Amino acid sequence: RPTTNSNGQPIAATEEGVKNFWKWFGDSKVVDAEGRPLVYYRATDSDRTEFRKSWRGGLIYFAATPEGAERATRAGNGATYPVYLKADNIRGWKGPGVYYGDAEAKGYEDKLVKGGFDAVKVRDEAARYGGTLAVLSPTQIKSAIGNSGEFDPANPSILRQQARGSITLPTDITKAPAIISL
């Protein structure tokens, strides 16, 4: 199995992390033509360790590009999160998808579950930016950067990441620059 994602970045920092990823990801359909996991994006106005269901339709939406994520939100000065999405049976995956209004309709989540689907491709304004994919559960989402490598299928947290970097301040900050390492 691949060790890099659709952006050419390592899936995880360690070999064990890559194994844990594939154990969690399984035979998910959210892969590129080379079988590498696709990276999706979600913009938000606050720090997140997990994403919750929409208050309207019960789905959790992600865009195929950072631009699509930013256009789909009113976040403004927020953060954009790159994530992996695990979805084994996606409604509309091979076709044009389902209209956003239909996906947000009352009872649509129940229809997906009854139909055996765990995600839906959504037709919306983000289509010009690569499209939108919505999943049913927070456990289907994991961070594509800085993940600790656990990829716990029962944990809705997108990351259990360890500290990623440091800031080194000189003794006299007026005479030497600070160094930020990531």
Which role does the model predict for each range below?
Residues 1-182:
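Active-site and NAD+-binding cores of ADP-ribose-processing enzymes
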